[in-house]
Design a protein with these regions (language model features):
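DNA replication initiation on ssDNA origins
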Residues: 1-111, 121, 127
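Catalytic micro-motifs at enzyme active sites that drive phosphoryl/nucleotidyl and oxygen chemistry
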Residues: 97-104, 128-146, 182-187
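Histidine-centered divalent-metal-coordination microenvironment in nucleic-acid enzymes
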Residues: 114, 137-164, 191
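Anionic group-transfer/hydrolysis microenvironments
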Residues: 117
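Helical (often loop-to-helix) elements that flank the catalytic cores of nucleotide-handling enzymes
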Residues: 123-134, 155-183
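Chromatin/DNA-recognition segments of nuclear transcriptional regulators
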Residues: 172, 187-191
Length: 191
C-alpha cells in the first residue's frame, strides 16, 4: 500500500480522482448547486423569526494565519461566497438556530455525511465498483476532499435534532463509517 506524504503527491492524487470520476460519468456540481440540493429552497431562514434554521459555515485558519470565522448562511445562500474556495472550511448538512455551530443549536439534519480519509485512486476505484454492484449503499453525492472523499446521503425529509435522537443518529453514522471505511476504501483503514 502506498502512503502519500507530500502535498504535491496528494494534489496529483486529487486530480487523478477527479479525472476518474469524470470518466465514470460523475458530474461536477458548482458549490451553490450542491448546497441547494442539500438545503432545498425554503428550508432555511429567509427572514428573522420564521422558525427555520440557518447554515453555519466555519473557516478554519492555520495557526498564526488569523482567527477562525463563522458565517451564518440563510435561504438565499448568498454568504456561501465567503467560504467557497477556502482551503479548509466546514459546512455540515445541518441547520442551526442562532449564530454558533453547537450541538445545542442544531435544528435539522438534511443529509448523513461520511468522511473517509486517505483515499487514493485505487481505493476510489474500489468504492465505485462496490457502489455499482450493490455491495455498498451508493451515496447521493460523492465529494473529493483532497486526501479523502465525503459521501453524502440526502434524507427525504430533514430530521429534527431532538436530544433523544442523538444516540440513534450517532450510532447510525458510526455504522456507516465502519461499513465504508475499510482496507479497500482507504490507505489507512479506520480500525
Amino acid at each position: 500500500k502506498r502512503d502519500y506524504k507530500t502535498v504535491s503527491e496528494w494534489k496529483k492524487a486529487y486530480r487523478d480522482k477527479a479525472k476518474l470520476m469524470n470518466e465514470r460519468g460523475y458530474r461536477e456540481l458548482q458549490p451553490k448547486e450542491f448546497y441547494r440540493a442539500i438545503f432545498p429552497e425554503g428550508s432555511l431562514q429567509s427572514r428573522e423569526h420564521d422558525g427555520k434554521g440557518n447554515i453555519i459555515a466555519t473557516q478554519i485558519r492555520p495557526s498564526g494565519k488569523g482567527r477562525t470565522k463563522q458565517w451564518v448562511i440563510d435561504d438565499s445562500l448568498n454568504m456561501l461566497d465567503k467560504v467557497i474556495g477556502d482551503s479548509f472550511g466546514l459546512i455540515p448538512p445541518l441547520s442551526f438556530y442562532g449564530k454558533t455551530h453547537t450541538k445545542e443549536n442544531a435544528h435539522q439534519l438534511f443529509a448523513m455525511a461520511i468522511d473517509i480519509d486517505y483515499v487514493g485512486l485505487q481505493q476510489l476505484k474500489n468504492m465505485l465498483k462496490q457502489f455499482g454492484n450493490g455491495v455498498q449503499l451508493c451515496p447521493t453525492f460523492l465529494v473529493s476532499s483532497g486526501k479523502g472523499v465525503h459521501l453524502y446521503y440526502l434524507l427525504k425529509e430533514p430530521v429534527e435534532l431532538y436530544a433523544n435522537r442523538e444516540k440513534l443518529l450517532s450510532a447510525l453514522k458510526e455504522d456507516f463509517i465502519r461499513r465504508h471505511w475499510n482496507d479497500t476504501s482507504s490507505i489507512r483503514p479506520d480500525n
